[in-house]
């Protein structure tokens, strides 16, 4: 089991932000379904990327890895071999996208994945696909992996719950490829910027769609994009961890985050706008974001535009000058972990004054102290706790941190290059007791 040992430290310097996971996975997906050959430059190398590559190879795509790019020749015909099984690994995007894609075929497709994926919701997407004519059969409980999908879906209208943007994104991709026309309405849409990112990809690939009402979208269907060339920019979600470390730094020098384009459609870029409103001294200069150590105020923060930033914002708010309420974050409960519970449990171990509420977190500023913590097998929890530990009094340890490779494989190396003091070591796997949180949650010391 990989464990971090973290001593108090501050960062400054200049680094390249790792490539965007969301763009990388969408680029691989669409290149594999395009006519001709596509080139993806600077893709993120991660377990999720590998899961997408292996799934697309099963469609018939030819994918060649080069030193800093992928060359992908799309499958010439949208057909599948019999009894195909797609392993989504631990990737929510591969899980949702291939569930929807499988529904356009007349061959049965089995979807499998890790035990972590088995707790992640899929029912709203399945119900929408069933309304289009797909059928599902389950090896265990309904709406849980593994299950089989049998299409093809046929033209019509449906509704899909918008509590997770990936449902609508997956449905939009299936409706673009299947024989249509199709239309659907997103009910109570959340995480809007991430669905907009999916629509941006459709626009770049000249795949037609229309929006008739605020949340209703229509698709002609039977679209096949042409091969393309795309360079993946930096991941604003990953950059958030470096940004908070830079804001809390005691160094007199700024931190330069390269490879961040503020014109990118990634949802989490709005987090940097929020940080400025809270008092952060941030300068945007071409594709570089310059972050100076700053004093941050708390406040009422709507998390919906950047839901993945909840753990690291919770850490930042512990060091703010006033209380904070992170709200509209119900979706954070259904990520790799229940992030509302997970970040509360672990920060309370450090002495944080933090409590969950019905859709988010209440946080009063408080000093943090070194502690032994657990990642909950969630990359964003592990990275957020790492930044918290850098600014705590005393040393800390975080166990089960292999999950960080999901989005930020060189996270520790980059932090240490900026003068952090973090060591990695392997310890024997043991039965780690995480508890239910009942002994901690609600015991806020303030």
From Swiss-Prot:
EC number annotated for this UniProt entry: 2.5.1.19
Main EC class the enzyme belongs to: transferase
Catalytic residues as annotated in Swiss-Prot or TrEMBL: 308
InterPro entries tied to this protein: Enolpyruvate_Tfrase_dom (IPR001986), Enolpyruvate_Tfrase_sf (IPR036968), EPSP_synthase (IPR006264), EPSP_synthase_CS (IPR023193), RNA3'P_cycl/enolpyr_Trfase_a/b (IPR013792)
Protein's pathway: Metabolic intermediate biosynthesis; chorismate biosynthesis; chorismate from D-erythrose 4-phosphate and phosphoenolpyruvate: step 6/7
Residues reported in the UniProt entry to bind 3-phosphoshikimate: 21-22, 26, 165-166, 308, 335
GO CC, alphabetical: cytoplasm
Localization (cell): Cytoplasm
GO terms (BP aspect): amino acid biosynthetic process; aromatic amino acid family biosynthetic process; chorismate biosynthetic process
Alphabetized UniProt keyword annotations: Amino-acid biosynthesis, Aromatic amino acid biosynthesis, Cytoplasm, Transferase
Gene Ontology molecular-function annotations: 3-phosphoshikimate 1-carboxyvinyltransferase activity
Reaction(s) the record says it catalyses: 3-phosphoshikimate + phosphoenolpyruvate = 5-O-(1-carboxyvinyl)-3-phosphoshikimate + phosphate
Keyword Cytoplasm recorded: yes
Binding, phosphoenolpyruvate: 21, 92, 120, 166, 339, 380, 406
Source species, domain of life: Bacteria
HAMAP family given in the database record: EPSP_synth
Listed name of the protein: 3-phosphoshikimate 1-carboxyvinyltransferase
Organism of derivation: Chlamydia caviae (strain ATCC VR-813 / DSM 19441 / 03DC25 / GPIC)
């Amino acid at each position: 089991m990989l464990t971090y040992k973290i001593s108090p430290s501050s960062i400054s310097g200049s680094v390249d932000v790792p490539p965007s996971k969301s763009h990388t996975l969408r680029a691989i997906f669409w290149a594999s379904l395009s006519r001709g050959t596509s080139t993806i430059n600077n893709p993120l190398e991660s377990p999720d990327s590998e899961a997408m590559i292996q799934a697309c190879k099963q469609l018939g795509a030819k994918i060649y890895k080069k030193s800093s790019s992928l060359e992908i020749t799309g499958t010439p015909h949208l057909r599948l071999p019999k009894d195909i099984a797609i392993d989504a690994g631990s990737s929510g995007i591969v899980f949702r996208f291939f569930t929807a894609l499988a529904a356009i075929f007349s061959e049965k497709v089995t979807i499998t994945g890790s035990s972590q994926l088995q707790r992640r919701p899929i029912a709203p997407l399945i119900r929408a696909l069933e309304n289009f004519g797909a059928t599902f059969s389950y090896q265990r409980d309904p709406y849980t992996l593994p299950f089989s999908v049998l299409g093809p879906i046929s033209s019509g209208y449906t509704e899909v719950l918008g509590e997770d943007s990936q449902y609508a994104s997956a449905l939009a991709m299936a409706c673009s490829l299947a024989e249509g026309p199709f239309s659907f309405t997103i009910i109570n849409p959340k995480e809007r910027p991430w669905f907009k990112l999916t629509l941006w990809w459709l626009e770049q690939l000249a795949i037609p769609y229309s929006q008739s009402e605020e949340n209703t979208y229509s698709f002609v269907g039977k679209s096949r994009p042409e091969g393309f060339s795309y360079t993946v920019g930096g991941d604003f979600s990953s950059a958030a961890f470096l940004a908070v470390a830079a804001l809390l730094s005691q160094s007199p020098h700024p931190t330069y985050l390269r490879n961040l384009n503020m014109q990118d459609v990634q949802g989490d870029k709005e987090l940097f706008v929020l940080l400025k409103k809270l008092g952060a001294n941030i300068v945007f200069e071409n594709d570089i974001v310059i972050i100076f150590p700053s004093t941050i105020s708390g406040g009422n923060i709507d998390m919906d535009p950047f839901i993945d930033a909840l753990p690291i914002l919770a850490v930042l708010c512990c060091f703010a000058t006033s209380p904070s309420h992170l709200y509209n974050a119900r979706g954070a409960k259904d990520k790799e972990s229940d992030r509302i519970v997970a970040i509360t449990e672990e920060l309370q171990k450090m002495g944080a004054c933090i409590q969950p509420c019905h859709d988010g977190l209440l946080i009063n500023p408080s000093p943090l102290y070194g502690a032994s913590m657990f990642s909950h097998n969630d990359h964003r929890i592990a990275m957020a706790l790492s930044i918290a530990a850098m600014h705590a009094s005393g040393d800390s340890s975080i166990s089960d941190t292999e999950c960080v490779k999901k989005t930020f494989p060189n996270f520790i190396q980059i932090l240490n290059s900026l003068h952090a003091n973090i060591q990695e070591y392997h310890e024997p796997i043991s039965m780690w007791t995480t508890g239910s949180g009942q002994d901690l949650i609600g015991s806020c010391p303030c």
